[in-house]
Regions:
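Short, N-terminal intrinsically disordered low-complexity segments that are rich in Pro/Gly
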Residues: 1, 23-24, 48, 52
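Juxta-kinase regulatory segment immediately upstream of eukaryotic protein kinase catalytic domains
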Residues: 1-17
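Conserved phosphate-coordination/catalytic loops
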Residues: 2, 28, 57
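Membrane-targeting and insertion segments and their boundary/processing signals
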Residues: 4-8, 30-33, 120
Length: 165
């Protein structure tokens, strides 16, 4: 067993999930990986973020802010930030894509998303995030994020590199 696997196993055991079945989930555009844990009828998500550049502390802080605003964010059941480990509430597989494919009205989903954005715009105060080390979202960061579309999304979605055309 690798040192990372031992760290994860110890974390899960300490929080009662050591014997849980583990199913890998699709990741996001980061070095993090996610496992769905199953223990009888209970489910949870393990966020494994071993890369120091993918600090979990901002995730925790943002989840807390969203909760204070009355918005949904996964409950953090356990955290070991120095090791990049979080045990999260499992919201299930109800992504917009899946829900729309199952017949949910897209307009209703987008209305809910816009409502959440309106709450953030109306009620969020920057001093609530003063301890979160997030980069300023300026033109340079915007371009960097847009380039992820070409560098990450296009190859994943189309199976080939993006072209200038």
């Amino acid at each position: 067993m690798t040192e990372r696997a031992e760290t994860i196993s110890s974390f899960l055991t300490a929080h009662g999930w050591g014997a849980a079945a583990r199913t890998p989930l699709a990741g996001d555009a980061s070095a993090r990986r996610y496992l769905r844990l199953a223990r009888g009828d209970e489910r949870a998500i393990l966020m494994d973020s071993p890369n120091p550049a993918e600090d979990v502390v901002p995730f925790i802080a943002i989840a807390n802010i969203l909760h204070r605003l009355g918005l949904s964010a996964p409950e953090i059941k356990a955290a070991q930030p120095d090791d990049g480990l979080l045990l999260l509430e499992d919201f299930g597989d109800g992504t917009f894509t899946r829900l729309i494919a199952q017949g949910t009205d897209p307009a209703e989903l987008y209305r809910l998303a816009v409502d959440a954005l309106a709450v953030i715009h109306r009620d969020f105060r920057p001093d609530q995030a003063s301890t979160i080390n997030l980069p300023r979202y300026d033109a340079d960061l915007f371009i960097e994020q847009v380039m992820l579309l070409a560098d990450v999304y296009v190859p994943a979605a189309l199976g080939r590199a993006a072209t200038a055309a």
